């Protein structure tokens, strides 16, 4: 995954097109790094050690994302349980994360390996469009799933009005909106001829911006559309969910206390009668805990994965003192690459909170199933042996001595005649 470079590539750059710099910015960064003004900043070289690190990180992310999301899809396909609306959203979220793996991470991995983009102009435009499309799809699928949970908890009566149809419309809207918002990539990126190695010409897939505000406008728009807006919506929806459940629990608790004191008075809140939406306090408590935990994990994972990338992007275009060689810092490069790690986390988060999905996923693989059966059998045998040993060492009086050592064993029993 990457944001565009500008119309000129400094010598210090790696193969990943991370920071969109103009020719003037690149030259000033080269001079600020301590090079002479007359030296050539256009050598077609890169930091090979850092490039190898980028390739390794992207390869691991790609493998983990594909395996994790494919396992979720396989578990959903083979589960014997009835498919719910949440399963529908999880399925499409996994598809969106697979799009991130194949349309975003994999092209960037190939690009890092070849250093320069190898392909015609139309392929350059398509690749850049699909990369951003995957970013939008993964973020917006999470948003519509959160919106569905908000409707289910805060407006339960609306779930009776064709809930499956509404869910499918929300999912379709997120896919279409993601495609439309990423369409400008076709007009921003193209194969551009650049000058390297003292006048040698080559081509690469770059973006062309109106200077000096074009780059800032693009990065700010992407940061707002992919990160800021989804985080605000996620936080707002889950905030209402937690508040609604907390108010429901408080109303139910007050009702129980009034019944215990013999007062037949319903709890009031701001002059309105508070009626619990769920019939069981225990059920509400579990739902509250599960919602709070899932909220914390989802929002935290999303922010931790995406925040470093967008912080670096915004810093690079809004800080006039930003030096190009700062992008060669391995820590900055790796934190930017880890944005795609969110697609690796999502399947395991939902399998953990869904419970049975993890079991269905394990049962989908024969090797894992045999391993689980072996461990279960070993545990059963160990329990059986412990139970047998415990039973043999207990006396008829449940003392710790053995049967033959018991004072009430068979040899001390006296047969007393019974009168008839």
Curated annotation (Swiss-Prot):
UniProt GO cellular component terms: plasma membrane
Cytoplasmic side: 76-92, 147-168, 247-294, 353-420
Positions of modified residues (Phosphoserine): 406
Sites of S-palmitoyl cysteine lipidation: 367-368
Known glycosylation sites: 27, 198
A GO MF label: vasopressin receptor activity
Bilayer disposition of the protein: Multi-pass membrane protein
Disulfide bonds: 124-205
Extracellular topological domain: 1-54, 114-125, 190-225, 316-331
Note: In prairie and pine voles, the 5' regulatory region of AVPR1A contains a microsatellite region that is virtually absent from montane and meadow voles. This species-specific microsatellite polymorphism modulates gene expression in a cell-type-dependent manner and generates a great individual variability in the brain expression pattern. This polymorphism is correlated with monogamous social organization.
Family recorded in the similarity comment: Belongs to the G-protein coupled receptor 1 family. Vasopressin/oxytocin receptor subfamily.
Name recorded for this polypeptide: Vasopressin V1a receptor
Source organism (scientific name): Microtus ochrogaster
Underlying gene: Avpr1a
């Amino acid at each position: 995954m990457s944001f565009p470079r500008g119309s000129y590539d400094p010598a210090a750059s790696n193969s990943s097109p991370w920071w969109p710099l103009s020719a003037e910015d690149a030259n000033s960064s080269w001079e600020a790094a301590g090079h002479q003004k007359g030296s050539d900043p256009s050598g077609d070289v890169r930091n090979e050690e850092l490039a190898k690190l980028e390739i390794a990180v992207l390869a691991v992310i790609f493998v983990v994302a594909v395996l994790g999301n494919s396992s979720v899809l396989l578990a959903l396909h083979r589960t014997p349980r009835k498919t719910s609306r949440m399963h529908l959203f999880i399925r499409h979220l996994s598809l969106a994360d697979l799009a991130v793996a194949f349309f975003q991470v994999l092209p960037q991995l190939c690009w890092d390996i070849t250093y320069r983009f190898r392909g015609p102009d139309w392929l350059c435009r398509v690749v850049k469009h699909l990369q951003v499309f995957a970013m939008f799809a993964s973020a917006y699928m999470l948003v519509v799933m959160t919106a569905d949970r908000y409707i289910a908890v805060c407006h339960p009566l609306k779930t009776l009005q064709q809930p499956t149809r509404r869910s499918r419309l929300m999912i379709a809207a997120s896919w279409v909106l993601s495609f439309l918002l990423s369409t400008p990539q076709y007009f921003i990126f193209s194969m551009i001829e650049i000058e390297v190695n003292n006048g040698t010409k080559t081509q690469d897939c770059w973006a062309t911006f109106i200077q000096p505000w074009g780059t800032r406008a693009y990065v700010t728009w992407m940061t707002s559309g992919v990160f800021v807006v989804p985080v605000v919506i996620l936080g707002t929806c889950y905030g209402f969910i937690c508040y609604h459940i907390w108010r429901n629990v408080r109303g139910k608790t007050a009702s129980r206390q009034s019944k215990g004191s013999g007062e037949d008075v319903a709890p009031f809140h701001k002059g309105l009668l508070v009626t619990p939406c769920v019939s069981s306090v225990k059920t509400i408590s579990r739902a509250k805990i599960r919602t709070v935990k899932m909220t914390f994990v989802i929002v935290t994972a999303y922010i931790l994965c995406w925040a470093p990338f967008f912080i670096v992007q915004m810093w690079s275009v809004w800080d006039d003192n930003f030096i190009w060689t700062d992008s060669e810092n391995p820590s900055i490069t790796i934190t930017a690459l880890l944005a795609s790690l969110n697609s690796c986390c999502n399947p395991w988060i939902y399998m953990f909170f869904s419970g049975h999905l993890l079991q269905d996923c394990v049962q989908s693989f024969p090797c894992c199933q045999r391993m689980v059966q072996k461990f279960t059998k070993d545990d059963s045998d160990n329990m059986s042996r412990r139970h047998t040993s415990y039973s043999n060492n207990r006396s008829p009086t449940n003392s710790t001595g053995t049967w033959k050592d018991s004072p009430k064993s068979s040899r001390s029993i006296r047969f007393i005649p019974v009168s008839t």
